[in-house]
């Protein structure tokens, strides 16, 4: 009798069975190489009895000694760890593990792992091959496990069966709650590499006041003047000279900036990323060395001078034999250096915009087309009042309304009056005026000399846009309250007026380039999505269905944003060095964030808000485009609808009523924290969804996924194809429009190309900017695209798996439709004069510089 009681208490081992499992893990590595010294040390620890143990946790059998939580199995250990050869190249290794199991224990719902080695390892998965009466049980882990002494609580992983909080097996609830508490931390202390804590902070680490006044930057976030989304907290100490500014780590340690360990790039991505950087540095340095022996070392003397950046280089052999050899190389960095896609090394790849023609980029048709199918197709709007009016406060900025008149444009409206053209939805505007004017006076005190622009366009019968007029404005010399001084330019193809028109378009491109980088790209994708990453990990358990839905769309975002704060958007960083707002760049983006509205990030809402579409319930996506051949919008609506259909199927499986949404305490805490902390500077905005209905959840999750995947792809991966040739999208202008009677005007008449190149981005800035966007435009080899998952076992629920499979098939159909549209000669905006088919919303891609592919997340 006593034996039965004891046997029951210890798990009934008299009828125990063996359950085999497979552990997939990757040892600590340095880029492509396994840390052999660390691996040897771990083997020594293993030989001394310091092992890696696993204990299953029952979801049905309680343990009185453990507060009636799920009972733990006896520890099981990795098998043959000592005798498994350590590969030189970093990669996954599978180990067996055998557990004692009995009928009373039932199905395991989680397991605890204890690493008593000295080094961390990456735990990919544990699969129990055949739990009696339950079959296979999968635990998808994808987490770095440090030595146990680094943690204050046990490392726990849950099986792939999702549960809403109220449906969680009683014996697993405490484990679920405690894991979330661990991930939240207590908001104190400096974060270390092994910490798994997600927390918030303001952008108070962009400047470095300890290095002088010129390196001071405004804190973004936490104020009405400069609101901003929150970033991940690092807990670094304050600077010596300003206790409100966070100190910075040395540039050489940039890769070590804190993000939770599981948010860091994987070894394949890090290898690709550093290889791309190495190649770009070489491509950057060689022209600079040549320039030392040039009479004008910081100037391109001609367009031929610019083109030499791309032509030549060392061409590696191509063909199946060489490809087979490189594919067999285990080291990703070397494989990437020896790419067989035809790219030369030691020269920049030829950007798509000049591949077919070296001059088509200069046409008015291409200038306008890129507003619909270029790298920044999300700004153009329909003109709804003429002349265009400013929304800036007239008390502070005077009269900012446009000086464009009907006389400037009516001869180009195919016989229509301005009112008739507007009423027929024929007039459109690219408007950068109000965003730039408040900062333009200060910007022009730097080496930048530029304008705020308005560009009017006419929708022609063939579906293309025709530029009508460009207005360039400067703050009034007597003060902001006196408004602006403006000049209007109209198209010309004759003499010096033609050269002036080309310069006017260049100033517009400079405006658009800066707005693209700071707002369309950085603010509207990178910055706004980070609070969602943090809140999801803090408030939604990995068991939560919505965590499982959103998790793939947050991959690598915190890491790339942290690196951006360290080397790109910081004081004196690459962004300040290459875009026209210079040191005012990030502050400008905070002012623009004042107008950010979460529901308006949904593609249909955005199109309607910009007036380029109208609501129409009879249209396939609920809106009708007023520019029918609008490649970004056409492809985007297909992608948007596919995402929404997938999210609807998924969420409807778990939530059938408003009550189920309201009683989900994790979901409500998640949304509350997003509003009040993550985007806390906008917490009182009336437009926030209340998260009270399944439809609000569906709409919100669709928008989050859209921002992280398709919107980012549309504004990121076209950077090199369109802006890799800087004359097409200059980032800086260095002098104003030449005035008659000046030496600059005479130069413009005699040598318009040289005058153009002396006006836009200088040679050094060009090389730096092109090097950066080449890196940012590449896909890494481990990229996971929309409609794909890292593991096929991401959930146990069959209906969501079937819905996800349907989503993938829909995306494949969309790819076929994009190919078909790109081959339709009637749709002239799909390729344009430069013959560059629109593929930025083509869902999949191979690695490298492809100009297509929608990664799941903001990952670069």
Curated annotation (Swiss-Prot):
Pathway this chain belongs to: Lipid metabolism; oxylipin biosynthesis
EC number: 1.13.11.58
PLAT domain span: 29-159
Cofactors required: Fe cation
Region (Disordered), start-end ranges: 209-246
UniProt keyword S-adenosyl-L-methionine, yes or no: no
Co-factor binding details: Binds 1 Fe cation per subunit. Iron is tightly bound.
Domain of life: Eukaryota
Chief localisation class: cytoplasm
Cellular location(s): Cytoplasm
Span of domain Lipoxygenase: 162-860
Record-level Gene Ontology MF annotations: linoleate 9S-lipoxygenase activity; metal ion binding; oxidoreductase activity, acting on single donors with incorporation of molecular oxygen, incorporation of two atoms of oxygen
Pfam families according to UniProt: Lipoxygenase (PF00305), PLAT (PF01477)
Positions annotated to bind Fe cation: 521, 526, 712, 716, 860
InterPro entries cross-referenced by the UniProt entry: LipOase, LipOase_C, LipOase_C_sf, LipOase_CS, LipOase_Fe_BS, LipOase_plant, Lipoxy_PLAT/LH2, Lipoxygenase_dom_3
GO biological process entries: fatty acid biosynthetic process; lipid oxidation; oxylipin biosynthetic process
Keywords (A to Z) from UniProt: Cytoplasm, Dioxygenase, Fatty acid biosynthesis, Fatty acid metabolism, Iron, Lipid biosynthesis, Lipid metabolism, Metal-binding, Oxidoreductase, Oxylipin biosynthesis
Reaction(s) the record says it catalyses: (9Z,12Z)-octadecadienoate + O2 = (9S)-hydroperoxy-(10E,12Z)-octadecadienoate
GO cellular component: cytoplasm
Role summary: Plant lipoxygenases may be involved in a number of diverse aspects of plant physiology including growth and development, pest resistance, and senescence or responses to wounding. Catalyzes the hydroperoxidation of lipids containing a cis,cis-1,4-pentadiene structure.
Subunit record text: Monomer.
Family recorded in the similarity comment: Belongs to the lipoxygenase family.
Protein name as it appears in the record: Probable linoleate 9S-lipoxygenase 4
Annotated organism of origin: Solanum tuberosum (Potato)
Gene that this polypeptide is encoded by: LOX1.4
